[in-house]
Each structure stands twice: as C-alpha cells, then as structure tokens.
Design a protein with these regions (language model features):
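Juxtamembrane interface helix immediately N-terminal to a transmembrane segment
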Residues: 1-7
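Hydrophobic alpha-helical segments of integral membrane proteins
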Residues: 13-15, 44-55
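N-terminal membrane insertion elements
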Residues: 28-49
Length: 321
C-alpha cells in the first residue's frame, strides 16, 4: 500500500518540475516495455521449438521402445516354438521303436559318426579335382566325408534319398558307385537302426531351419549392440542339449548348413555372418561328445565355455556388430 501511494504521484511531480524530463521518462518506460515484449516473443518462440523437439524425442523413444518390445515378443515366440519342435520330435525306426526329443538327435549323431567311420575306411571315387580348402589341418577327403556322412543320415538311403545324393552337384565325391558302396557298408548302428529308411529330413529339417532363422533374426537387429545380441542368442543356446549341439556342428559343416558360417569364410568372408563363431553356438559342447580338435580345425576362434579368451577372440569381439 505504501509503494502504491508513493509511486502514484511521482510522475505528476516530475511533470510539474520539468515536463521534458517527464517525456523522456515515459519514452524510457515505453522502450523498456517494448524490449521486454520482444524478449517475451523470443522466449515464447524458443519454448515452442523446445516443446516440439521434446515431443519428437519422446515419440522417437516410444517408437524405439515399441520396436524393442515387438522384437522381444517375436523372438521369445521363436524360442518357444523351437523348443516345442525339439521336445515333440518323434522318429519311428524300421523295427517299430519310437524315439522322442533328444533321443532323436542321439540316434542321428550315432549314425553320422558311424557313416563317417565307414567312409574313411573306403576309397571313394572322385571324377574331378576338388579345390583346396581354406581350413588348416583339414584334408579334402575329411571335409567331404563329413559332408557325405551328414547328408546320408539326413536324406537316408531309400530310393528317394539315393536319388537326391546322386544328383547332388555340391560334392563330386558323391556318385552312383559311391552310393552303392555306402549302401553295402553302412549297415546297422549299435541300436540296430539301418539307413534304408527315409532319413531324418522330415523331422530335423524344419527344426534346423527354425533354429537358423531365430539366430539370424537377432543378428540382423541393427538397434542392438553385439553384447545385447550375444545375450539373446545365449538364451537359445542354453536350451540346446549336448546331442542337439553336436548334430548342429555336423549340420554346419555340410552343404545343407553352410550358411551357418562356412559360406561366409574365404573369398566371401563376412565375420558378422559367421554365426557359429560369433555367438559360440557350440561352445557348451563337451570335449568327449565331438573331438575338440576337429571343431577347432573349422572354427579356430570359437570359444568353449571352459577356455580362456584368446587374443584373436578379443579382437573379433571389438569388430563384431
């Protein structure tokens, strides 16, 4: 109240003393008010711009969150579907015995190993030279015998399986004569199962396609760091039994599973598509299940869970995306 009564007569007193000073004083006030008005307009504009930027950032973060939630939702569905496919797998042997889940992979692994041993004890014909292999310590015959052993078990040695193997253009060691020799030598395994049945393609083909697509889906997520991708793939890897992991190893060495890594070695080298090594997909495999020396021949930079980190592996981790 005091300041109201004090300030109210002040302009009039100033006008009575010197009208020119009163005019200057009013002009100063008007200029000040005008300046504050300009500043207010500027601040209002800046506030509006800040609001738009804040809204944009909020929407962008919300979009990222939605995309991440969508990725996780789809990935966990793939995990569930892949596990269900493995658990519900059923294979009926020619003698009528049924094998379920991991038992199917156990039988398949035994047949692959028996087939490989059979192949290495025979001289299979080759009609044309085979190009040199990029893996140190791996002979041409060893790689091709692994490929044949897996494909024979996958397709089987029934009429259709033999036809597929004979028409294969990915391996010139496979010929009609070779198939006849395999058919004669590959008798029964210790479980009494013969290879004249239709093979395992109807049971494991879908499983391995789904497994590959699940890991590839994670690998292609540009919004994730390599560390984040590794943790997601680690969830899937933890679901695999030792038998599944061992069969996966042989699958990755065959023509059928070359996209796991071998297709991206050598001339077409792309470390970010070499999924076996990048995500240590067979790193939990016990040494007695598959010879570790054999694994290291094809995947020298893959780290087993009980091994220390090598210098080369550390370099790769920094390069992975």
């Amino acid at each position: 109240m005091f300041w109201t009564w004090f300030c109210f007569p002040f302009p009039w007193i100033l006008y009575a003393i010197d009208p020119s000073k009163f005019s200057s004083w009013t002009q100063c006030i008007n200029q000040t008010v005008e300046n504050y008005g300009n500043i207010g307009s500027l601040l209002a504009g800046l506030t509006a711009i800040a609001s738009v930027l804040l809204l944009y950032e909020t929407l962008r973060e919300q979009q990222k969150s939605n995309q991440h939630n969508e990725f996780e939702s789809r990935y966990f569905k793939l995990l569930e579907a892949n596990r269900k496919t493995a658990d519900q797998m059923k294979w009926t042997a020619p003698d009528g015995n049924e094998y379920h889940g991991s038992q199917v992979f156990q039988i398949m692994l035994e047949l692959i190993e028996n087939s490989y041993k059979t192949l290495t004890t025979r001289d299979l014909p080759s009609e044309s030279p085979v190009p040199c292999l990029p893996w140190q310590g791996v002979s041409v015959e060893q790689k091709h015998f692994i490929n044949i052993a897996y494909k024979v078990v996958f397709w089987g040695l029934d009429t259709r399986g033999k036809s597929i193997l004979e028409k294969s253009d990915a391996n010139d060691l496979i010929s009609s004569e070779s198939i006849r020799m395999l058919d004669a030598r590959m008798g029964t395994s210790t479980t009494g199962i013969r290879l004249e049945n239709g093979g395992f393609h109807a049971y494991t083909g879908h499983y391995f396609r789904m497994l590959y697509q699940s890991i590839r889906y994670v690998n292609e997520q540009d919004s994730l760091t390599y560390r984040q991708k590794y943790e997601y793939v680690k969830m899937l890897r933890a679901q695999l039994s030792n038998m599944e992991t061992a069969v996966l190893f042989y699958d990755s060495l065959s023509d059928l599973g070359a996209d796991w890594e071998l297709s991206w070695q050598g001339a077409n080298s792309n470390i970010n598509k070499q999924l076996i090594t990048k995500y240590n997909l067979i790193g939990n495999l016990p040494d007695g299940m598959v010879p570790r020396k054999l694994v290291k021949k094809f995947y020298p930079n893959m780290k087993f869970s009980d091994e220390p980190m090598t210098e080369e592996r550390c370099k790769l981790k920094k390069m992975y995306a």
